[in-house]
């Protein structure tokens, strides 16, 4: 898995993670939204392929998929301004990756 070691886990509940495509990371970016991290840490932290992807137009605030595996409320998502990119060559975002 591309980012299994880099995503954080929440001791009290399953981690709520946003998996989105990034222009520099074909396999996806893991944003541990339920962890006490500052916004500057919500940056690309895992890449399966470091090669630059083909040119594409950014789609602001359009996540490719959500992995919400938690019965607890999801804090902080409204205050985080996400800019994601859709790429046809991206691998599917699977729960085992995060």
Swiss-Prot record:
Wool. Coiled coil: none annotated. Keywords: Acetylation, Keratin. Interacts with wool keratins. The lineage of its organism: Eukaryota, Metazoa, Chordata, Craniata, Vertebrata. It comes from Ovis aries. In the wool cortex, wool keratin intermediate filaments are embedded in an interfilamentous matrix, consisting of hair keratin-associated proteins (KRTAP), which are essential for the formation of a rigid and resistant wool shaft through their extensive disulfide bond cross-linking with abundant cysteine residues of wool keratins. The matrix proteins include the high-sulfur and high-glycine-tyrosine keratins. The modification N-acetylalanine is found at residue 1. Pfam families: Keratin_matx. This is Keratin, high sulfur matrix protein, IIIB3. Transmembrane segments: none annotated. Belongs to the KRTAP type 3 family. One of its GO terms (cellular component) is keratin filament. GO terms for molecular function: structural molecule activity.
